[in-house]
């Protein structure tokens, strides 16, 4: 079921209590009334469900639940069976993007241009389900949606939107986002990629190198950020096959192995003037993309965390040592309680942030807070789960070690844990601490 044109039939709730009338003596009736009141009092007492501790489900719309459940089925039936070998062999299957396009989950918050136009919370739920399988798969979707489709939608011309967005939404085109460079990571203002304007043929010549670029080896469209002659940083749309453009693969990764990662090398690439994004003329454009990407990450890592929690819990229940299940051990229960607490708080914070985003009330610092917190906690949870599985924890057949290795990268990209601390520190004190001289 695709997300486009989702229609939901609301079902009326059937009362859970049915009263049966019987002919009984008054004494028996009094006794029965007493028992019934006692049972009602007991049944009305709130029950704690560890799978949804603060009842997140009741705070989602019917559409959001349907979207999540539909995508969950796809992720578990189509992606989970292939991730083990994909990770072992360091392979990303291009058809996954096409399948996501058929489902309508690419650029899902964009309205029009073949996109679903769903809520920010719905997008977060999609990221959560996808990263429950693998962070590399979620990374591919995150790049396609917030980092490629968003800048075209937000900063592009109408001609650019019409040309690229429908094909990106269908998964016909795969995009990548080029900002990080070999000598420019956490400080993108120091980028060395240059764009020189050619007035004779109204084009730009781009020279430079981008690195650690998700999707680049397989990309059809490259959103690249470069410094122009006036000192401003602008975004450009490069297409596969342009002369001087190459995207070699980075191999030997121990993290995000099921994601295609590479470089973007531009050696005198001539780009038509109409391929420049007219609505972005500073780093603020790229930061706007990253802000949306970080939001999806904050949701996604909790999906990986939930997988680790559920796996560790089941292992602790099944594994017998000293004649009892590991789950009987107080230390094990304490670790599970810590995991559950952090996941629950993170999910409800993400829900609140998603609602604020849809009201245009989400400050970038809010996103930094959750990207930093949730990634750090998710990494801790994965490491803890790995430890709880003992020697089995390092086997990829249990998947936990894969999540732990993936989250090392996720905790780093789109703003490291410490960079987001400095963003928050600046908001708290009013003093920027990124450099000593400013």
Curated annotation (Swiss-Prot):
The EC number of this protein is 1.3.8.6
Keywords assigned by UniProt, alphabetized: Acetylation, FAD, Flavoprotein, Mitochondrion, Oxidoreductase, Transit peptide
Q: Can you tell me where the transmembrane regions are?
A: none
Q: Which residues carry this modification: N6-acetyllysine?
A: 240
What is any one GO biological process for this UniProt entry? L-tryptophan metabolic process
**Residues the record lists as binding substrate:** 138-139, 186, 287-294, 415
Molecular function (GO) terms for this protein are: fatty-acyl-CoA binding; flavin adenine dinucleotide binding; glutaryl-CoA dehydrogenase activity
Entry cofactors:
FAD
Keyword set includes Mitochondrion: yes
Q: Look up the domain of life of the source.
A: Eukaryota
| Keyword Transit peptide listed | yes
Annotated residues that bind FAD are located at 177-186, 212-214, 319, 330, 387-391, 416-418, 434
The record ties this protein, via InterPro entries, to: Acyl-CoA_DH_CS, Acyl-CoA_Oxase/DH_mid-dom, Acyl-CoA_Oxase/DH_mid-dom_sf, AcylCo_DH-like_C, AcylCo_DH/oxidase_C, AcylCoA_DH/ox_N, AcylCoA_DH/ox_N_sf, AcylCoA_DH/oxidase_NM_dom_sf
| Stretches assigned to coiled coil | none
Describe the protein's quaternary organization and the partners it interacts with. Answer: Homotetramer.
The protein's matches in PANTHER family, at most eight in alphabetical order, are given as: GLUTARYL-COA DEHYDROGENASE, MITOCHONDRIAL
Protein name (database record): Glutaryl-CoA dehydrogenase, mitochondrial
Organism encoding this protein:
Macaca fascicularis (Crab-eating macaque)
Q: What gene does this protein come from?
A: GCDH
């Amino acid at each position: 079921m695709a997300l486009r044109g989702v229609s939901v039939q609301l079902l009326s709730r059937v009362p859970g209590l049915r009263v049966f009338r019987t002919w009984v003596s008054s004494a028996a009736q009094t006794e029965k009334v007493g028992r019934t009141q006692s049972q009602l009092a007991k049944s009305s007492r709130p029950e704690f469900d560890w799978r949804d501790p603060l009842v997140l489900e009741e705070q989602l719309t019917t559409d959001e639940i349907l979207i999540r459940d539909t995508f969950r089925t796809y992720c578990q039936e189509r992606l989970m069976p292939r991730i083990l070998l994909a990770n072992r062999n360091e392979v990303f299957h291009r058809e996954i993007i096409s399948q996501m396009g058929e489902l309508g989950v690419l650029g899902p918050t964009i309205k029009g241009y073949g996109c679903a136009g769903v809520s920010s919370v719905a997008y977060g739920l999609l990221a959560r389900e996808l990263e429950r399988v693998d962070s590399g798969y979620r990374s591919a979707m995150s790049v396609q949606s917030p980092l490629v489709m968003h800048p075209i939608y937000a900063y592009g011309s109408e001609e650019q939107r019409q040309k690229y967005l429908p094909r990106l939404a269908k998964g016909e085109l795969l995009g990548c986002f080029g900002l990080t460079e070999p000598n420019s990571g956490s400080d993108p203002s120091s980028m060395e990629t240059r764009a020189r304007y050619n007035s004779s043929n109204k084009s730009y010549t781009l020279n430079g190198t981008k690195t650690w670029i998700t999707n680049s080896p397989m990309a059809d469209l490259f959103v690249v950020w470069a410094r122009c002659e006036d000192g401003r940083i602008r975004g450009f749309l490069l297409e596969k096959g342009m002369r001087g453009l190459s995207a070699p693969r980075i191999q030997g990764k121990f993290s995000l192995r099921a994601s295609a990662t590479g470089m973007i090398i531009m050696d005198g690439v001539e780009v038509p003037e109409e391929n420049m994004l007219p609505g972005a003329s500073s780093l603020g454009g790229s930061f706007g993309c990253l802000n949306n990407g970080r939001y999806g990450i904050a949701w996604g890592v909790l999906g990986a965390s939930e997988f680790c929690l559920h796996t560790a819990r089941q292992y602790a229940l099944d594994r017998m040592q000293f004649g009892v299940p590991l789950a009987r051990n107080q230390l094990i229960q304490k670790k599970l309680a810590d995991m559950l607490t952090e996941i629950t708080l993170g999910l409800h914070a993400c829900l609140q942030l998603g609602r604020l985003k849809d009201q245009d009330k989400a400050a970038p610092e809010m996103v930094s807070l959750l990207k930093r917190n949730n990634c750090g906690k998710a990494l801790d949870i994965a490491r803890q789960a790995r430890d709880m599985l003992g020697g089995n924890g390092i086997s990829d057949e249990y998947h936990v070690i894969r999540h732990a290795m993936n989250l090392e990268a996720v905790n780093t990209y789109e703003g490291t844990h410490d960079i987001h601390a400095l963003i928050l520190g600046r908001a708290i004190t009013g003093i920027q601490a990124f450099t000593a001289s400013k």
